[in-house]
């Protein structure tokens, strides 16, 4: 009979742990793509961009991985834990329609870091739209101006055009990094 209180305690702890498991699983986004074990060329480009541009908070590359159909995902970027996360509807719009979104995020309550985000079509060396590139810049001093929007659009365009010169084809982004 002396074992009963200990057994009840163990059972209570186990039940509490099991009860919170679905909540933890719900917090993590469901991945729609798994990257290969080795670093891909796209990740190398992302790493090089971040190293060369301290004004950036992040860069992410999005699109449909080769061999997939309508699986829009982040496949490289400065947030490795997000690789394989499904794209949001606005990400897909940029990829499909070739539009650019200028998103000054200095008033968002969910973002802990103030930033200026530009979502734009990613291009290859030939100028073909091949997906989405997202640049998040450190917050400008005067973010509420059209001059800030023009400045960040110009910076993002220059970065994107420079990146395009390093992309022979979309498929090459998924080749092993050298």
Give the positions of each predicted feature:
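Short glycine-/small-residue motifs
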Residues: 131-132
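Short N-terminal helix-loop-first-beta-strand/juxtamembrane motif that initiates sensory/input modules
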Residues: 47-69, 161, 165-173
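Extracytoplasmic/periplasmic sensor domains and loops in membrane signaling proteins
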Residues: 40-42, 77-107
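Bacterial N-terminal signal peptides that target proteins for export
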Residues: 1-11
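Juxtadomain coupling helices with adjacent low-complexity linkers
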Residues: 29-43, 137-178
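Bacterial N-terminal signal peptides
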Residues: 10-20
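Sec/Tat signal peptide C-region and signal peptidase I cleavage site
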Residues: 21-25
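A short beta-strand signature within small-molecule sensing/ligand-binding domains used
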Residues: 112-121
């Amino acid at each position: 009979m002396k074992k009963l209180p200990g057994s009840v305690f163990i059972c209570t702890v186990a039940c509490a742990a099991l009860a919170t498991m679905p909540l933890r699983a719900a917090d993590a986004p469901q991945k729609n793509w798994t990257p290969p074990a080795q670093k891909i060329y796209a990740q190398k480009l992302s790493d090089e961009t971040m190293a060369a541009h301290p004004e950036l908070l992040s860069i992410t590359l999005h699109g449909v991985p080769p061999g997939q159909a309508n699986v829009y995902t982040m496949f490289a970027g400065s947030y490795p834990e997000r690789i394989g996360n499904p794209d949001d509807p606005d990400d897909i719009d940029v990829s499909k329609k070739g539009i650019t979104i200028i998103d000054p995020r200095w008033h968002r309550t969910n973002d802990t870091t103030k930033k200026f985000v530009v979502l734009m079509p990613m291009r290859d060396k030939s100028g073909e739209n091949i997906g989405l590139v997202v640049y998040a810049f450190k917050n400008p001093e005067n973010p509420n101006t059209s001059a800030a929007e023009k400045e960040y659009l110009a910076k993002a365009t220059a970065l994107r055009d420079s990146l395009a010169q390093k992309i022979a084809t979309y498929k090459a982004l998924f080749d092993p990094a050298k």
